[in-house]
Structures are given as structure tokens and as C-alpha cells.
Amino acid sequence: MGDSRETFGPKAFVTGFPIKHSRSPLIHGYWLKTLGLPGSYRAHEVAPEAFADFIASLKDGSSGFAGGNVTIPHKELAFRLADRPDALSQELGASNTLWLEDDLLHATNTDGRGFTANLDERHPGWDRHDTAVIFGAGGASRAIIQAVRDRGFKTIHVVNRTVGRARELADRFGPKVHAHPAGALAEVMKGAGLFINTTSLGMDGEAAPQLDFTPLTADAVVTDIVYVPLKTPLLAQAQEQGFPIVDGLGMLLHQAVPGFEKWFGKRPVVDAALRALIIADMEAH
């Protein structure tokens, strides 16, 4: 029998396709329990062809949800179907957090805030530099480019195997963003103070190319948005070469904070116990 607190209070969700491996219910469940709040948060799988109907049920109240998180492959459609997407969502063309307010469906994207909050927690002062290198130009890189630019970085080099994808991002995010092919990586790393891997290289223990991080500034920070494994091959290489590293788990944890506050009315804290809980779950699967 479930906790009686789940029967009352706001109900929130995470939806995607597939969604069964999401750790978001663990994160929000931890906060509901530690804060002693009524409410529930659960995974709710929705196929792409059913997503518009799901959003309609959210808007008219028949779903019973106060809002929720949206992940792959629904972020772009969530943005388009929301009544009030904010400026972050509008620039990205994607939303990952939805909530009902004044009978309207509002939307934002918290990925960038999760990324910067993770660096603020794990390596304060990371933003004193003005040049960043972003390795990869997939969907995940959009929010990170936006967040790094908005934190004051003057030059952002996006390096991608297919340079056309990187050019699309440069066109979207303005003159501070520069597109480069993979062969230019060593050159654009010179003098950069932040290196961000947004590719899947090294995910789930896959092999990753050997990278020389020494062209970076001596105090540059190297971070990876991949968090399985926690220390990716790229992070291990950077650490071996003497650079401070920040893993990607904190981005997952911190991006969840704004939504929880919207649905349940209290701002939660990313603490060591939550991080340990998620790491234990990762190790168990």
C-alpha cells in the first residue's frame, strides 16, 4: 500500500517514450518525503502519436496532473502545444517543464539552469573564463550553449563531426557562437577555460577517443553531460592530465528543482543524500 500522502496534494509526471528508465520519480519522491509534502510524481509513458491528446487532457484538467517533466522525444511538441512558453523555451524551441497556472499551460526549459547550477555547486568560479568549447551539436547542446552564453562567456566554439549541425546552432544563438569541424578541436581548445562534452562518447562504458586537453588554460574545467558512467572516459582522461572535472549527474538533479517548486510549492535542495540515492540506483541497474 502506498504512502497516504500520495492520495492528496498535487500530482506531477515525467513523460517520454520510452520512460521506464527515468530516475526523475526517485528524485522527486525523495524531495516529497524529506520535505513532508503531500503529492505524487510518477512516470507516465506517452507514445508520440498520443502526445497531443495527453497535453489536451492536461489543459482541461481531466488528466489530474498539475504539471510535469517532458523528455525525449516530446520536448519540441511540448513547446509548440503550451499556451505560455517562456523566453528560454522560445529560443530553444523545446520545453522540458510544464505547469498549469491561471488555467493556462506554461512551459520552460530547465536544462541550462541544471547545467550551470551543477557547475556552481561542484566547481565554483568556473564562469570566470570567457571562452568555452562545446563538443557535439545534438539536441542537448542547445540549452547548454544558451546557458553558457547567458553566464557571460564571450566566445563559444561548437565542434561537431557534421559541421552543418554546428552552423545551425551558431545561426540560432548569435555571433558569440562559432561552428567548427571535428578536425579543428585541438586548435579551438587553445586558451579555453571550459570544455563541455555533449556527445554520447563514453556512455555506458563505450570506448572514447584519446583527447589532449593541454591546450586548455591550466585551470580550465572539463565537464560531461553524460552521467552513466559517472566518470566517463573523457573525464578520466582530463583528470589524468591534471584538470578539474565535473560529472553530469548534478545537471539531472538541479534541472529538476524549478519544476518541483512550481508543482509542490517549496524549493527543494540538491544534497549529498539525494546524489548518493541516485548513484546507488545507477549501480544497482
Swiss-Prot record:
Gene3D superfamilies attached to this UniProt entry: Leucine Dehydrogenase, chain A, domain 1, NAD(P)-binding Rossmann-like Domain
Organism of this sequence: Rhizobium etli (strain CIAT 652)
UniProt-recorded name of the protein: Shikimate dehydrogenase (NADP(+))
The organism's place on the tree of life at top rank: Bacteria
Biological process according to GO: amino acid biosynthetic process; aromatic amino acid family biosynthetic process; chorismate biosynthetic process; shikimate metabolic process
A Pfam family per the record: Shikimate_DH
The protein's enzyme class: oxidoreductase
Keywords of this entry: Amino-acid biosynthesis, Aromatic amino acid biosynthesis, NADP, Oxidoreductase
Active site: 75
GO molecular function, one term: NADP binding
Keyword NADP recorded: yes
SUBUNIT field: Homodimer.
Ligase among keywords: no
